Swiss-Prot record:
The keyword Metal-binding applies. The RNAP catalytic core consists of 2 alpha, 1 beta, 1 beta' and 1 omega subunit. When a sigma factor is associated with the core the holoenzyme is formed, which can initiate transcription. It comes from Paenarthrobacter aurescens (strain TC1). This is DNA-directed RNA polymerase subunit beta'. It catalyses: RNA(n) + a ribonucleoside 5'-triphosphate = RNA(n+1) + diphosphate. Belongs to the RNA polymerase beta' chain family. GO terms for cellular component: DNA-directed RNA polymerase complex. The lineage of its organism: Bacteria, Bacillati, Actinomycetota, Actinomycetes, Micrococcales. Mg(2+) binds at residues 535, 537, 539. Keywords: DNA-directed RNA polymerase, Magnesium, Metal-binding, Nucleotidyltransferase, Transcription, Transferase, Zinc. Its EC number is 2.7.7.6. DNA-dependent RNA polymerase catalyzes the transcription of DNA into RNA using the four ribonucleoside triphosphates as substrates. The gene is rpoC. InterPro entries: DNA-dir_RpoC_beta_prime, DNA-dir_RpoC_beta_prime_bact, RNA_pol_asu, RNA_pol_N, RNA_pol_Rpb1_1, RNA_pol_Rpb1_3, RNA_pol_Rpb1_3_sf, RNA_pol_Rpb1_4. Disulfide bonds: none annotated. Its cofactor is Mg(2+); Zn(2+).
Amino acid sequence: MSSESSFGLMQIGLATAEDIRGWSYGEVKKPETINYRTLKPEKDGLFCEKIFGPSRDWECYCGKYKRVRFKGIICERCGVEVTRAKVRRERMGHIELAAPVTHIWYFKGVPSRLGYLLDLAPKDLEKVIYFAAYMITSVDTESRHAELPNLQVEHDLEKKQMVDNRDSDIATIARDLEDELARLEGEGAKAADKKKARDSADRQMANVRKRADADIERLEQVWDRFKNLKVADLEGDEGLYRELRDRYGLYFEGSMGAEAIKKRLETFDMQAEAESLRDTIQNGKGQRKTRALKRLKVVNAFLTTNNSPLGMVLDAVPVIPPELRPMVQLDGGRFATSDLNDLYRRVINRNNRLKRLLDLGAPEIIVNNEKRMLQEAVDSLFDNGRRGRPVTGPGNRPLKSLSDMLKGKQGRFRQNLLGKRVDYSGRSVIVVGPQLKLHQCGLPKQMALELFKPFVMKRLVDLNHAQNIKSAKRMVERYRPQVWDVLEEIITEHPVLLNRAPTLHRLGIQAFEPQLVEGKAIQLHPLVCGAFNADFDGDQMAVHLPLSPEAQAEARILMLSSNNILKPSDGRPVTLPSQDMIIGLYHLTTKRVGSAGEGRIFSSVSEAIMAYDARDLHLNSQVKIRLDDFVPYAGWEAPEGWEPGQPALVETSLGQVIFNQTLPEDYPWVEAVADKGELSRIVNDLAERYPKVVTAATLDNLKDAGFYWATRSGVTVAISDIEVPTSKPAILAGYENMAAKIQGQYDKGLIDDDERRQELIEIWNKATNEIAQAMRDSLSPMNTINRMVSSGARGNWMQVRQIAGIRGLVANPKGEIIPRPIKSSYREGLSVLEYFIATHGARKGLADTALRTANSGYLTRRLVDVSQDVIVREEDCGTERGLVTPIAVPDSNGELVLDENVENSAYARTLAVDVVDAQGNVLAAGGTDCGDVVIDQLLAAGITEVKVRSVLTCESKVGTCALCYGRSLATGKTVDIGEAVGIIAAQSIGEPGTQLTMRTFHTGGAVSAGGGDDITQGLPRIQELFEARTPKGVAPIAEAAGRITIEESERQMRLVITPDDGSEEIAYPVLRRSRLLIEDGEHVSVGQKLINGPVDPKQVLRIMGPRAAQKFLVDEVQGVYRSQGIGIHDKHVEVIVRQMLRRVTVIESGDSDLLPGELAERARFEDENRRVVSEGKAPASGRPELMGITKASLATESWLSAASFQETTRVLTQAAMEGKSDPLLGLKENVIIGKLIPAGTGLPRYTEVTVEPTEEAKASLFTGPSAFTDFSYDALGGDGAPEFHAIPLDDYDLGNDFR
C-alpha cells in the first residue's frame, strides 16, 4: 500500500484446496507445539520454524546461521530460512486432510447454502455429512434402462426360487410331522404328546414362512428401490443399501460423508439447474416459487462468479500464523495458549489416526466413525458450538474458534481493525483554566515532555545541547533545565487534540494550543465544557498529538476549539457562557431603583468608573453617560440632529456600559438584562454575522467579565434565602376540603376508582401550582436563589418549589402517579412516610439513566453504520425537485410570525426555485442559502412557505450533493465536498438520545383517550421508527377516498369504506374500545387516520408512496425530540430516512439481470432498467422498500462494513459465495484496510493535487541572462556582484512531484 489509492476494490471469494496449498509454507503433520525441555518449536508441529519462519531474527533453528549477513539462506541442516522473526505473523501452513470435510458455514448457516444448491433439507444434509445416511451420487440410467428386462427376469426367477424353496421346506416339515405322528400312534402315545409334536411342527412352519416372506419382501423392496433410483436419493437403512450395492452396484454409485457431497458437486450442472429454476419461477406458485427464488440466488451466485462450489468442501485446512495464536510461558513454568492451538491439535490427531486406519485397511464402520470425528473437529475449529455441544476447555468454557475471533466487540473487526490503540497520547484529570483563551488548554509539564519526547530530543541535538540522540534521551529523562526551554519552543503553534469519552458527537474531540502548566492536571477552558459535556468533579480527558504537518494543519484549521463554536446538530452556538459567568453578567446588567448616584450624568465612561471607585455610584443605578462610539439598537430614539458616529448621551447603567464593552465595537448597543436567553441570542448573532476570530475574542471577553463580576456580586446561598410562603397552610386547607369531597363521592359509589384518582391528581396539581406561584411572589428580586433561577445560571423553578414550597405528587415504581401528594418541602423536612414514597422516583431515575445510556449508544452505532457512506460527492446533482417548507404562520391577530420549527426546517437550506412576491418580483433567487437574514426578509415580504432543496430529493448516485444538503451547520457555510454528512447526522440524532426518557409512559392509570393505553415515547419510539417496526396498537389509514360506514357487533367493530371510484369495499376490523377519529357516513381521503393510535410507516409507504413515508418518518422522529425540548435539524433525520428507503424489491425481472424478490439499490435498479430499455427489451418492475436501520446496514453493498457491524459469519458466508467486491466507498471499509477515509481531505480531489508554478514564479526562477552564450563568467570571479540571484531550491516548490 505504497500510495493512498493503490487499489480501489476488495474482493472476497471461496478458497479452493489449491489456493490453501498456495498460501501455505508447508504441511503441519504433528499436533506438538513446543518442546517442554528446550522450549523450542517441534519440527512439523503447530509452531514449526521450517514452515512458519524463525522464532529469532536472522537465526535458524539449529544455530548454524546467525546474523543478518546470511539473510535469505535456507539452512541445509534444519531447513529454516534465515529472515526476520516477524514473518511468523504472516506465513501460513496447512493440514492435508485424509478425507474431505464440508465447511460448516455453508451447511449449517441459515439458510443452508449447500442445502439450497443441492436441493436438500438441512436435516438430510446433516445425515449424509455425519455418516447417518448414504447418498446416491450417480446413476447409469442408460444401462439400467437397457438391462431392466433381463434384470426383471432374473428378479422374477429369484423370487420364484425363493417361493419354491419356502414351499418345499414347509412340505418337508409336513412330511416329517406325518411320519412322527405315525410313529407315536404305533407306540400308543398319549394325545398330549401328539399335540406337542403338531405344535412344534406348526412353529417351525411359521418360522420358515416368516423368514422367507421377509426375504421376499426385502427382495421386492431392493428391486423397487433400484428401479426408481435417482441421483441425490438418501438411504438411511445400511442393510438395504449394502444389498442394493451387492446386487446392482454396477449401475450406481453412492457414499456418505463429505465425499458424497463432493462427488455430487463435481457432477452438478449449474446451467441446467438455473434454467429449470427460472422455469419454475415463471410458471410455479406459492411455496415452490418462493423456494425456487431462494435456490436461484445461490445457483446464480456460483454461475456469475468464478467461485467453484467445490470450495464448500475442504481437502486441506489452512493453519493461521503462529503469532496470531501464541503460546506464552507463565511464571510457574506452565504455558498459556490460544484456544485455536487446542482445536488445531484435535484436527491433526484425528487426521493422523484416520490416515493410519486407512493404511491398515480398517473396516468401513471404523473408518467412517473416524471421518465423522474429523468432520466434527474441523467444524469446531471453524465455528465452535454452531452444531451440537461446543468443545470445552478447562472449567467447561467453550473454546474460541476462528469465527469467534471475528465476531462481537472483542473480535478482530471491532477490536483491532476499527479501534486501534494510539501512541503519543496521555490522559489526566481536568481542572478549570479560567485564564486560558478559547483556543488554549493547559498541559502538565511532565505529560507534555513525554508526548513531545522525540521532538525535544531532536531539537536538543540540533542546538548542540546533546551530542547524539542517546544522550538527548538521557537529558530528557533527568529533566535537565535546557529541556524545559526546548519544550517551550517546540509546543508553540503545535496543537494537541483533547478527547473526553464518551465521544457522542464530533465536538467530543477538539484541538487546542497547549500552554505548559505546573501540576499534573489538564486545564480546560470553561466555555468548551458544554461541547465535551465535561465538568470538574473528577472527569478525565485524553490528549493526542497530531504528528505530520498535514495532521497539524487539519487540527488547526478544522478542529481548533475557536473554529467549533456551532453545534453540528442545529447550527446554534455550543460555547455559551454558563453558571458563574451568567450570574456575573446578570449582576452587571440588572437595574436597581433607588441606588447610589441614580439620575446623574457623566461626560465619559471613565468619569463614571471614577465615581464607582469612589463609592458615589452603584453599578446598577440608572444614569446618563456620554458614549463616543455608540451604535444604536432598534427602537432607540435619537435626539434631533444626531448622526451615526457622533457621541451620544445614553440613559443606561455603568454595569450595562461595562457589559457592552465586551462586545465588538460595531455591535448594536444591548440594553436588555444579560440572562441566559439574551446571551444565547448575542452569541448566535455573533456567530451568524461576524468572523470566527471576533466571535472567539468576544466569548473570551464575556467569560472574563462574567467571572470577575460573579466574584464581586457576592452571590451565596444560605438556608435563610429559602422562604416558605406564609399562605401555604391556607392554600393546602382549601384543596384538602376539595379532596375530601371527592373521597366522599367515591365512598358513596357515585364515582369509580379511576375517576377518583384522576380527580385527585388534578386537584393536587392545581394546589402545587398555586403554592409555587405564591412562593415565587414572596421571593424578593434580590434574593440570590431568585437571581440564579431567573438568570438561567443554575436550577429551575421546579427545584426551588420542592425546596421552599411543596414537593407535590410523585410516582410509584410502576410509573403511576400516587394520588396523595408530599405536602412538605425540603426546607420544612419530610415525614417518614413522605420520605419513603419519595425514594421510589429517585431510584427509578438512576436505573433509567443507566439503561438509557446503553440503549442510546447502541442506537448511535446503528445510525452511524447505516449512514457512514453518505458523503458530499458533488457540487450539484441538477435536480429540479425539493420540499415545500413553511416559514411563517398567522398568529391569533392574523399577523405573520415565524413558524416555531423554521430553525430546524427551512433554516440553512438552499432555495430550490426563485421566491417571488405577489407582484412577481424576485425576493430571493434559487440556489440562495436560507439564513436568518434571508428568512427575516421573506417574512417581512409576507411569504409563508418556500421550496427548498433536500437530501430526500437529491439525485446523486452515491452520497449526496452540496446544494441539496445546504449549509453545514457546524461551520455556517455551504457544505464542503467530502464532508461526511452521514456520520454527522447519526451523531446529531444519537447524542441527545440519552436525554430522551426511557419508559413507555403510562398515563397514571387514567382512563384517558384509548382506555389508558401505553403510549410509546422517548427512546423506544425513536428506535421503533428507525427500525421501521410496526408499532403496538396500530391505527389503520384509509386506502381509498370514499364514504365510511361503521358496523358494530358483539366482539368488534368494522369500518367499511365504499370507494368513490366504485371499486370493491375495504373493511378494517378494529377493537370496540378504539377511539374513532371519524363519524358514520363521513367522507375520508386517502391516507386519513381512522382511529386513535400510532400509524405503521410501512402502510404509509404502501398507500401513499415514498414521499409521504419520508415526511411521516421525519415528522414523527422530530416530534419525539421536540417534546423533550431538543432541537435537531430536519436534514439530519432526512439523511437517515433516505438510507432507509434506498432499496427496491424487484417484482418482475423482465429481461434484466435482476432476480424477482431481490433487494436492489435504487441506483442499480434504474441503471439496469435504462440499459434494458435502450436495447429495446422489457424493464424490471419493483416497489420501494422501507428497511430498518439494522437491516439496511446489513444489506449494504460493502461486505466489509456489514461484516464489522453484526452477524459477521452470515455476512462473510454470503459475500464469499457471491464473490462480492467492496468498492470501498464508505468510511468504515477504508478504516478496516488502513487507507485514508474518502471524506474531507482524504478525497481523491484533494489528495491528487499537483502544484503548477505561476508564470511570474517561472520568470523569477530564470532571471539573469537568457542564454548561456551571453553569459559572462567575470560576474562570478570579479569583484562586482553577479547580475542575478540564485534561489535556494528547497525554498521553492517547482511543482514537480519528486516523491
